[in-house]
Structures are given as structure tokens and as C-alpha cells.
């Protein structure tokens, strides 16, 4: 109901938490009266939190020895990193599937129009996963690093993954009459990333590479290990180009063309000697097909956000580096120019050549 010109059927920002059961919002205009109460009951729907902007060490109590350094000083020996918010995005037909790192999975239905918001997949889908990927050939949705009990986030297993029934976003319980199922990878401590490749899905842990292939009923998908000691450094640090996979590891660059190979890199020491390992999960990979180049955007050791790029020409086998902050990159497959994003919430139309051309940012 409208009370004194105030319409509560709107979107608001919470400006103050009063106590455990109440908060304050600010309306965009003044009320036309001074009614103290009324208007009936209110049902509120909340957006998810934006998550941390940067990764930080999780300095737990008891790190290092008693009396080391000064009170309140963070101890750099902590091995726990609290990752910045990352998203995985993929198409399921015309719709968008989005998963927040260690969070829920959401569907944006394009038929509802651009002003509608993405919604949760519902109560039958896992409540927490590391990331998602759609098998476009078989029309299954994969959730990696997900829950062994779909309703319990505390059962999230970083090496466990599920796939939905074919053509379904809500059927995750395996049955004799569907193709839903699950598998677990053995080598590593967590699944880091995955890309679709020719005839299979390539999945990396922090230690190894695995291939996921469709095998039909009753198992639907099977897995086999393709490489060891060749883990992925970040969720978005791998890419497939014409059936060959290229990725950035913790201390070297690799490729897979049927066999895992460590790539000779003339700038390897320059990159890894000045890399922020705290913020390594921000690393993003893209390909510029016009110039046969793969780019890895990464944060330098003194940065909290991406500020550099290392580039590999996969036809010439050459490398170079530069200073450029991009958080994602899409080559000019669909649009006239490549499209990229940067940390200040801008969408950037990149020039196809850098000579005398300035990239134009657009707010998003």
C-alpha cells in the first residue's frame, strides 16, 4: 500500500542495521504526511551480498609462535586465503547461468526482459559450488566443487562435482530414469577451473588435469586423468583455442594437445617473480583471434587488482608483457571489436590495433 506518498513496492538500499530484527532504509523523496503506522504487512526479498573486492589472508588466531611481532599485526605465514568474489557465467540456450564462488547458482531468463533479475535454481539444486559450466553438446549443467548433500552448504566438497539431468536445471538427484549424477576427482585439494574442448570437458585441480567425457547410460559421464603436477593457478586462467588448451600454473605455463606440455616462456621469471599470490585467483585469460594471441591478465606483487598482462602468440611461439588492467576479455567473435572489463565496473571496447587508438570504457 501507498502511505503518505511512500510506495514500498520498490528496491531500497539498507542504510543502517538497527538490531537483529530491524533496519533502516531511505526513500528518494519526502513523505506527504506524518502517519506513524499502517499500510499492512511487508514481504522483503533480498539480493545476495556483493562479496569481497580483493583476496586477503585469513590470519587465524595462533598463527606463528607466541610473542612474535606486535599485537594486531597480520602474520604472513597464514596459508588460508579468503578469495575475492568470482563469478562463472555460461549460456544455457538463450538464458544465462551464473555461479558465485562458493555460493549459489542462478538463472537469468532472457524471455522475461532485461529488467528482471536472475533467480536461484531452486531448492533441488546444490546450495554452494565453486563454479558452473554448461556442456553445450549434451545440455547438462555441471557444478564443480559442490555439495554432497544438495541442501547443506557444510557438505561442500572442493573435489566433488555434479551434473544435472539432460535439458534440466532443477533435476540433480540421480535416478534410473534420468542422466543426473556425480563424480569426484582424486588428485589435488580442490577443483580450480574447467573449459569445454573437443569431445570433452577439461577440468583442473590445483595439482592435475582431467578429462570428462560423455559415455552414455548408466554412468552418463566418465573421467580420466590427463596430467599431474600441472595444476591451474586461477579459475579463469585456462582457455581452449581450436581444440588445444593453454593455461597458467602456479609457476609455469602449460598446454594440452593430447599430451600435457610445459611451455617454454622467455618472460616466465619476470611474471612469477612479481606476482601477487594472494590475489592470484583474479587472473583472467582471453584470446585475440585476429592476432593469434592469448593474454593472461594478472596482479603484480604490490597490487590488489590486475594491473599487468603477459601475452603468448600461439602461431609464432613468442611472448611479451605489458601493463594493462582487464578482469575479463572476449575476442571479436561476435562484435566488431574485442570486449573486455576492468575493475572500475567499466566495459571496454578494445581497438583491433593499438596504434593511435584509445580504448573507450562504458559504465556497467
Question: Model regions: which residues?
Answer:
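Secondary-structure transition/turn motif
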Residues: 26-34, 101, 111, 298-300, ...
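A short beta-strand motif characteristic of beta-propeller blades
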Residues: 72-75, 117-122, 178-184, 222-227
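Beta-sheet-dominated scaffold domains
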Residues: 187-364
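Hydrophobic or amphipathic alpha-helical targeting/insertion segments
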Residues: 95-99, 103-107
